[in-house]
A protein has these predicted regions:
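Scaffold/interface architecture of coatomer-like assemblies
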Residues: 1-282
Length: 282
């Protein structure tokens, strides 16, 4: 994909939280650093994705893993049949638990999810950055990560700030499920903030269910979200290749007779070039 093209995978919902169908290009306004941009690409299709299942494998997850594994498979089964996926299990470190980069085989993903020995700490940020790196190898233009964890990061080499920055260098959409009910109030608050910052930067969502039984229905919602997005893309009017962060905003102008509509997409990107050496695309 052209590194100068900025791609925005965008979810639009109404006041009741339902997906807004039937919108056209003229219903969208895209602003970069508050300057309106002209769309070069607009589509709403159920396009296949390259997806990473990034699952906490620390000691505290031992009793939750069977339900979480089943929920992750539900996500795969409810997604586009042409999707490709990989599994990362993480504790003190992170592990790619497939014999190949990606697969669309549910039995192979099931085997990778069950290849666990729940122990150790939670290196969430390292796992997210490693998974962002791996998902770039995917053949599909659209990239997605699902993170499931039950606590705050307590052992990563990378910081939350660096992780968010790495997210903003890609157009990968990240969803997170935080099973935080057994954490102390302070720890749960820090973990919630981290997951919200990571997902918001990407245009995804963070969910915080009370228990592991709810993870399956959340995974069904995530699959539905992925399959009901609009893809918007533009060439920025600011052509400087200076590596700076550009804030992006998508506004929806509802057709007559439709109520208020709200767009959710990534909050910006890093321009190509400059000291960061980053790109705006994949």
């Amino acid at each position: 994909m052209d590194v100068n093209l900025v791609v925005l995978h965008t979810t639009v919902i109404d006041d009741r939280g339902r997906f807004a169908d039937g919108l056209k290009q003229e219903n969208f306004r895209v602003l970069e650093d508050k300057v309106e941009q002209k769309l070069s690409l607009f589509k709403r299709e159920d396009i296949p994705v390259s997806m990473g299942l990034v699952i906490d494998n620390s000691g505290s997850m031992r009793d939750k893993r069977p339900r979480v594994n089943q929920a992750a498979l539900t996500l795969v089964e409810a997604s586009n049949p042409q999707d490709e996926a990989f599994v990362v299990n993480f504790n003190d470190d992170f592990y790619l638990d497939l014999d190949k980069d990606f697969t669309n085989s549910v039995p192979e993903l099931k085997e990778a999810l069950e290849r666990i020995d729940s122990r150790g700490s939670t290196a969430l940020y390292d796992a997210v950055i490693g998974s962002l790196d791996h998902v770039k190898k995917g053949k599909k233009d659209k990239k997605v990560l699902l993170i499931v964890t039950d606590g705050e990061d307590n052992t990563s080499h990378n910081s939350l700030e660096k992780t968010v920055r790495e997210v903003q260098k890609t157009d990968t959409v990240i969803y997170a499920i935080g099973l935080l009910s057994e954490e102390s109030k302070k720890s749960a608050k820090r973990a919630k903030r981290a997951l919200e910052e990571i997902t918001k930067a990407s245009g995804g969502l963070a969910y915080f269910p009370e228990n592991a039984e709810d993870v399956r229905s959340i995974c069904e919602q995530v699959a539905h979200d992925i399959r009901n997005q609009y893809t918007l893309a533009y060439y920025p009017t600011n052509t400087k290749r200076d590596g700076t962060f550009r804030a992006v905003q998508v506004e929806v102008v509802p057709p007559r007779g439709r109520g208020r509509l709200q767009a959710r997409t990534r909050n910006g990107y890093y321009a190509p070039g400059g000291p960061t050496g980053s790109t705006s695309g994949n």
